[in-house]
Each structure stands twice: as C-alpha cells, then as structure tokens.
Design a protein with these regions (language model features):
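Thiamine diphosphate
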Residues: 1-170
Length: 170
C-alpha cells in the first residue's frame, strides 16, 4: 500500500471529514486522493493560515479536519496557531510534506524546511517526522488522536524518503 493510501486510511479511521489544502507537486497526489474520496469535504485555501480558521470553524461545527500542505507553507500558519488554535484549545492536524532537506534544489525552501521540526518546537507545536513508508497509517492515526484528544496542534512531517522529492526542472 502506498503512503498516500495509508494516509487516506489513517484520516478516515480518525473521522477526519474536512481537508483544507494548498497544492504543491509533492502533496498533490494525497490531495487528489482526498478530493476523489466521498468521505472528505475538501477546501482549497489561498494561504495556509486561512486553513487554521477553516479547520477551527469545522471543529466548532462538530467536524474534524486536517491541513495538507508543504513545509514552507506551514510556516505561514505559526501566528494563527499561536493566537487562535493554542489559546482557544482548537485542535489542528497538519499532514505536511517536507522541503529543504534531502533532495532539495531550491535554496528558498531550505531556511524553514530544513529547520521545520525545531521551528515547530519553538512555537510549542508538537510534531513527528515520518521517515519510512511502513507505518504511515499508524502515524496519521496517532497524530490525529493526539491533536483531537488534547485539543492542540499536531503536525506530521512527511519526509522525502516517504514522498519522493521535487526535482529541479532542466
């Protein structure tokens, strides 16, 4: 089973109903799988921090949701997570493809992408990096359980060793 199939299964098994997303080459197969699955309502956001508001509203309306994006975009959510999700105890689940590390060609992705685990730690957002495809479903389920039971943000970083990496156009 691919990492995408496992992630979809993990989201379904934890009752995720809404997916907010911002497209990127690496995360797009997961986004497309969610869009093709009737279990999910998908919402395209123009900026990642807007997803924090969308998903907070979903939670207040009785639904669970998750953000699918890449790591450089996740950095845009820090203020919304720190000023809305955390003080209001609104859960947030991010399934995030990591840029800026193995296989990265774009220097602009390195600053936040390479340092993303530490940046998340600095803003008190718990996180876990998934390095192999063997247990993606379990990791998604565990991250969702943590986010929703504690009503706090949790980010699952999908490493390029799982997702593959974006190659430079020649």
């Amino acid at each position: 089973m691919t990492w995408i199939d496992q992630a979809i299964n993990g989201l379904k098994r934890t009752d995720i109903e809404m997916i907010a997303y911002l497209p990127d080459t690496t995360i797009s197969p997961l986004v497309e799988a969610a869009k093709d699955d009737d279990a999910f309502e998908t919402v395209l956001v123009t900026r990642e921090e807007a997803a924090v508001g969308v998903l907070s509203g979903a939670w207040l309306g009785g639904k669970r949701g998750a953000l699918l994006c890449q790591s450089s975009g996740l950095a845009n959510t820090f203020n919304a997570l720190s000023s809305l999700s955390m003080p209001a105890r609104l859960p947030f689940l991010g399934i995030v493809t990591r840029r800026g590390d193995l296989g990265e060609f774009n220097l602009a992705q390195v600053t936040s992408g390479y340092n993303m685990p530490e940046l998340l730690d600095d803003v008190n957002v718990r996180n876990h990096s998934v390095h192999d495809e063997d247990n993606v479903e379990e990791r998604v389920r565990m991250a969702a359980t943590t986010a929703f039971s504690t009503e706090t943000p949790y980010v699952l970083l999908m490493e390029t060793t799982v997702t593959g990496y974006k190659e430079e156009s020649k």
